[in-house]
Amino acid sequence: PMGREIKVQVNESKTQNKKPFFLLAPVGANSKSPTSLPVYSLYEMSFAKQKYTDIVIEIDNIKHKPDTFPIPIECSKNYLTRYSADTFNVDWNTNFTGKLYPLIPSINNTVSDKGINYELDKKNNHYEIKCIHASNHKHKINVKFCPAIPDIICLKQGIELDGNFSITTDNAKGNIKGYYRIEKKENDICLEIKSNKGWTPNEKRWILKILFYFVKVFQEWPKTYLWNAKISLNDTTNLYMHSEWKRI
């Protein structure tokens, strides 16, 4: 079947005197069946000023008006339309069903696989994951666990472990925080991750603090994301995992 025809045209006649800022794009706010936690970072982000911007939106030849922003920013009325020429998009912990393969740590307690780097703690000859990070030529994402995620194969029967995690990009502009939970049930390891504290921006400008206070979707959409996984330990040399995200 053919998809819908979408036409978008934006003409901005004046861009001077803007004070861009960082924003975690709320792309996940409307997803009903997420396949990951979308950590999409917009650097040097700006809103489009109504006075100097013409926007045309057509879907199946039907024109739509762009949403406007409820409060003025930089003494101007703005469209909710936002853009950035510097983005860093990470789909974290995508849904997965299949076998898990072992990774061999180096002597400095790190391991890399498919562009993802793991920092480990070694306790009683068992490795624990304390940090995961990845980067492109310009930006970097960090996922930290406190306490570190233990060696799941060696967990005692019936044990339940709780911890916290935080996600930051470039260690500066804000963070996503939440909890993780691990439980061993017979021959299965059950894991749960929820970003229940949402996104906390790190902005000092008062107008941005007001913006994030009144437009709550920017901070709160991650709170609705829940990840569950089950890892089968029937054969410790041939681990199998099924994991998925859902909105709650």
Regions found by a protein language model. Give the residues of each.
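Structured soluble/peripheral alpha/beta segments that form catalytic or ligand/cofactor-binding pockets
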Residues: P1-I248
